[in-house]
Amino acid sequence: MPNKQFRVERLAQQIQREVDDILLKRVRDPRVNGVTVTGVDVTGDLQQATIYYTILSKLASDAEKTQTGLDKATGLVRSELGSRLNIFKAPEIKFVRDPSIEYGSRIDELLNELHKNNEL
């Protein structure tokens, strides 16, 4: 079964590259500007793909608008994926905001603050 896992990982990487390109070049919705695809999880049967993304803004309203824009663009992204990927059926896709970038940024802030306090 390691061969199947390799295929799933390879497909996830290809989906990440293609979705990033599709969002940049094909989706014209201004709510989707500044979106970076950080990762993709594909189920073992290749039927569903969860696409993780981040945005530059930290405002909650921008996050909601971006999620709405991505939800509206799901059909276009899936049809483009179907034409670009060499697979029988394009997976159902779901966009999820990736909290790990903000979490890492918060940890950096806390460490810097701790470092400044130790220097005093």
Swiss-Prot record:
Example of a GO biological process term: maturation of SSU-rRNA
Main location: cytoplasm
Cellular component, GO annotation: cytosol
InterPro entries (alphabetical): KH_dom-like_a/b (IPR015946), RbfA (IPR000238), RbfA_dom_sf (IPR023799), Ribosome-bd_factorA_CS (IPR020053)
GO molecular function terms noted in the UniProt entry: ribosomal small subunit binding
Function: One of several proteins that assist in the late maturation steps of the functional core of the 30S ribosomal subunit. Associates with free 30S ribosomal subunits (but not with 30S subunits that are part of 70S ribosomes or polysomes). Required for efficient processing of 16S rRNA. May interact with the 5'-terminal helix region of 16S rRNA.
Protein name: Ribosome-binding factor A
Organism: Limosilactobacillus fermentum (strain NBRC 3956 / LMG 18251)
Gene that encodes it: rbfA
